[in-house]
Design a protein with these regions (language model features):
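Hydrophobic packing positions characteristic
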Residues: 1-133
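C-terminal intramolecular chaperone/autoprocessing and neck/assembly modules of extracellular spikes
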Residues: 134-140
Length: 140
């Protein structure tokens, strides 16, 4: 019995890299295709998010986003049915657009973006229009 090989196989079954093949925005879940498993498609997987109780973030990866998934160990008997999408990651195929570690930026396919430089400047660009709603807005 090759214990090292068995452990590596179990780890590869728990942590898997795949590509998002469909998105369910209502349930905040995705299906993921695993090319290394003959394009096997997962059940709908929940996405790990920032905040999920009173302060909530909403972000679902787009179709074709490369993601890292974590599945419950096979010994539980559930395989690719019970797991989570931990998130997307940069790669040669999908490199970051920013390289400054102080910058926080969200860019959208239409050209809109929100960028904070970490030094006090926030740049917001909306491709069509920008809506601000508040009882009072101060611009100086």
């Amino acid at each position: 019995m090759d214990i090292k090989g068995t452990v590596l196989r179990i780890i590869r079954d728990i942590f898997r890299i795949g590509k998002v093949s469909s998105v369910n925005g209502t349930n905040c879940t995705v299906r993921v295709t695993f090319p290394d498993k003959d394009n096997l498609v997962s059940d709908e997987l929940p996405i790990i998010v920032i905040g999920s109780y009173k302060t909530k973030g909403y972000w679902v990866p787009e179709v074709n986003t490369q993601v890292l998934c974590c599945f419950l160990p096979i010994i539980s008997g559930v395989g690719l049915n019970k797991g989570f999408v931990l998130g997307g990651f940069y790669s040669v195929e999908d490199p970051p657009e920013e390289t400054d570690p102080d910058v926080r930026c969200i860019k959208f396919p239409d050209g809109s973006f929100f960028r904070f430089d970490g030094k006090g400047t926030i740049h917001i660009h909306a491709d069509k229009h920008l809506v601000l709603t508040a009882p009072r807005i101060d611009l100086n």
